[in-house]
Amino acid sequence: EISCSLVGSEMCIRDRSSNIAVVVPSFQNNDRNYLIVSGEDFTLEFNKHNGYLCRYDVDGMQLMEDGSALTPNFWRAPTDNDFGAGLQHRYAAWKNPELKLTSLKHDIENEQAVVRAEYDMKSIGGKLFLTYTINNKGAVKVTQKMEADKSKKVSDMFRFGMQLRMPVTFNEIEYYGRGPGENYSDRNHAARIGKYRQTVEEQFYPYIRPQETGTKTDIRWWRLLNIGGNGLQFVADAPFSASALNYTIESLDDGAGKDQRHSPEVEKANFTNFCIDKAQTGLACVNSWGAIALEKYRLSYQDYEFSFIMNPVYHKLK
């Protein structure tokens, strides 16, 4: 029996079935471009130029799309409501906050590998900290922390979370949260909390014009799996929101002005684009098309911290 827990700021995995010695992860730092973390059945790579996790292999299974990275994400493809309120302009700084890596450190702590990356947010004026804690099973606790510059006046943001691209074969979803349809912080009272099994293809709603779609809220755990039942499970110490689509945020984004495209015109991506958020701004328009979300459903510029665990799900042949 193996249990995984996230309590406060600590991650631990306990194997109660044996007393086999723990194989502590190790670092390889002799590559000019990548910091490599390896264990008994897994390999992770961090790009030394931007600090991002860019490779995640477990038991020979590739969990990240080639050429991609786990990246901070503050933007969504604006909805019709967002356009009505002009949020594509008002929130524009969050589309590319110009993150600049200022520090990348690594160490072994409590028999776990720890990687810490620090960033300046040039267009926002704050600082971002990403911490990755990797245990002997290849599970990764990710902590995303932002310290706002209180002296600056900065707009609200669409979301606070991260984005991950997985190979297209990871197209099966299991989750415990609100469903079965898409739901948002100010549009979820009719969505029942329960356990759901769906496909990535089912997540996209073909609005007349492409826009944000597919998010689920109040999630306790979320799994993205392939046909063999292998993949990743995401858990956090508080309910979170998530989505998985065969479309990128960029492909659904009409930019500063509506392109008058239609959803069938958007080209599908050949991978699964997963977004995991501490929170996302509500859909708004309570009393008019141009109204922004109520204050309790908005994400103001302030300090934030979000932690979640990526736990490999795989059936090891003995």
Describe each region flagged by the PLM:
Residues 2-8, 12-15:
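Single conserved hydrophobic/aromatic residue that forms the stacking wall/gate
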Residues 16-318:
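Beta-strand/loop-rich accessory regions of lumenal/periplasmic or secreted enzymes
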